[in-house]
């Protein structure tokens, strides 16, 4: 019988720690729904004790997700664990994931605790977590730099207290594949009760080896859970990439001999959603989900693929969710045709009101753009879902701008503030700068623009532009996304979306690491 590899997604927790990737509750819910549709085994929805916002997001996701196990991180203390348990109460299936640092450096410099104190606190934490669930995970933070004898003692102790998953962390991405794989193997061999728990790997990508280290932990070490994120999202250089782990194991089943339960056709749609929400653009040559992942420029390669796809393609683009860039609808298409195409794309809206609003946006786009592609429809629905779920303090109404060679462009933006229309006018170094200045002339947010990027949703000169802006204020970083065939209008929408997030403030109370 083939072993199953458990996929533990931590996009909503560890992925969110990437500077600028902070998500609203509504955005987390949208991603969680996609992860469930992808059949992810465990969704780490956040860190309940870190903020009221994270608690609420976990609590809501726990009530909505039915087919995946929902998890919350908790430090090794009763208060954090109680908070996690309270947040997870609505879940069909839940896990508490508790952690404490075990490396000499972390114990001395960060925790200011002796090894004996850490050992006792780890055991007590797992014992307390078991009062709420028999699904308890323990992580020794900075495990790859911990003393082997001490690490074995701690892990033996927490397994004795009832930990069912032991997660070996390479917190700073210091490991190399053979070393890390042997670390997991040695732990499993030396700990007398290791057979009572599933071993897991959690690797960071600081040296570009997160995926390789994770796979070594599986093949050499015998781990049967991989902790990962969509697009490898995470602080510093990121985390282990879910899509790369899944497709490596599926494509090379002859080597790994493992099964994963993931619906791989949901990988690309989920990747695009995470990229849109966080503002982190996927590099074109990124494995599996990059725009060039299945592109062939070499004439020899193109000829080979045309004759037989498996000459240069080891997996099929459609198997991971890439769809042909085809024209599907036009301005004469009706609501039923639009709804049917959404169903074919596996896209759902929460209410008839959202469907009607999305259809009106589609009709508006069709009047301005002769060719409507699947990607346009997905962008419309994503934008509508975001607008329906976010609280719109500011709302874009209209834009006019004028520019001539040798003169500074002028922009006039009409938008509403809590339902009351205001008009901002300003000049700038370009039409986009003038537009954002016009908005700021009325808002006066005092924020700093950290990022402005534009991507074409489809090909051709009529393509919709997708603009991402990242704003910073008082140490808080937010993203906003806007789409429109007019790049300047898309920029205004993105900026206003970011301002709405700044307006609904939810700061983290406690730092989180693993």
Swiss-Prot record:
<dbReference type="InterPro" id="IPR050073">
    <property type="entry name" value="2-IPM_HCS-like"/>
</dbReference>
<dbReference type="InterPro" id="IPR054691">
    <property type="entry name" value="LeuA/HCS_post-cat"/>
</dbReference>
<feature type="binding site">
    <location>
        <position position="204"/>
    </location>
    <ligand>
        <name>Mn(2+)</name>
    </ligand>
</feature>
<dbReference type="InterPro" id="IPR000891">
    <property type="entry name" value="PYR_CT"/>
</dbReference>
<dbReference type="GO" id="GO:0009098">
    <property type="term" value="P:L-leucine biosynthetic process"/>
</dbReference>
<keyword id="KW-0100">Branched-chain amino acid biosynthesis</keyword>
<feature type="binding site">
    <location>
        <position position="239"/>
    </location>
    <ligand>
        <name>Mn(2+)</name>
    </ligand>
</feature>
<comment type="similarity">
    <text>Belongs to the alpha-IPM synthase/homocitrate synthase family. LeuA type 1 subfamily.</text>
</comment>
<keyword id="KW-0963">Cytoplasm</keyword>
<keyword id="KW-0464">Manganese</keyword>
<keyword id="KW-0808">Transferase</keyword>
<dbReference type="Pfam" id="PF22617">
    <property type="entry name" value="HCS_D2"/>
</dbReference>
<dbReference type="GO" id="GO:0003985">
    <property type="term" value="F:acetyl-CoA C-acetyltransferase activity"/>
</dbReference>
<dbReference type="Pfam" id="PF08502">
    <property type="entry name" value="LeuA_dimer"/>
</dbReference>
<protein>
    <recommendedName>
        <fullName>2-isopropylmalate synthase</fullName>
        <ecNumber>2.3.3.13</ecNumber>
    </recommendedName>
</protein>
<dbReference type="InterPro" id="IPR036230">
    <property type="entry name" value="LeuA_allosteric_dom_sf"/>
</dbReference>
<comment type="subunit">
    <text>Homodimer.</text>
</comment>
<dbReference type="GO" id="GO:0003852">
    <property type="term" value="F:2-isopropylmalate synthase activity"/>
</dbReference>
<dbReference type="GO" id="GO:0030145">
    <property type="term" value="F:manganese ion binding"/>
</dbReference>
<feature type="domain" description="Pyruvate carboxyltransferase">
    <location>
        <begin position="5"/>
        <end position="268"/>
    </location>
</feature>
<dbReference type="Pfam" id="PF00682">
    <property type="entry name" value="HMGL-like"/>
</dbReference>
<dbReference type="InterPro" id="IPR002034">
    <property type="entry name" value="AIPM/Hcit_synth_CS"/>
</dbReference>
<keyword id="KW-0028">Amino-acid biosynthesis</keyword>
<keyword id="KW-0479">Metal-binding</keyword>
<feature type="region of interest" description="Regulatory domain">
    <location>
        <begin position="395"/>
        <end position="514"/>
    </location>
</feature>
<dbReference type="InterPro" id="IPR005671">
    <property type="entry name" value="LeuA_bact_synth"/>
</dbReference>
<comment type="function">
    <text>Catalyzes the condensation of the acetyl group of acetyl-CoA with 3-methyl-2-oxobutanoate (2-ketoisovalerate) to form 3-carboxy-3-hydroxy-4-methylpentanoate (2-isopropylmalate).</text>
</comment>
<keyword id="KW-0432">Leucine biosynthesis</keyword>
<dbReference type="InterPro" id="IPR013709">
    <property type="entry name" value="2-isopropylmalate_synth_dimer"/>
</dbReference>
<feature type="binding site">
    <location>
        <position position="202"/>
    </location>
    <ligand>
        <name>Mn(2+)</name>
    </ligand>
</feature>
<dbReference type="InterPro" id="IPR013785">
    <property type="entry name" value="Aldolase_TIM"/>
</dbReference>
<feature type="binding site">
    <location>
        <position position="14"/>
    </location>
    <ligand>
        <name>Mn(2+)</name>
    </ligand>
</feature>
<dbReference type="GO" id="GO:0005829">
    <property type="term" value="C:cytosol"/>
</dbReference>
<comment type="pathway">
    <text>Amino-acid biosynthesis; L-leucine biosynthesis; L-leucine from 3-methyl-2-oxobutanoate: step 1/4.</text>
</comment>
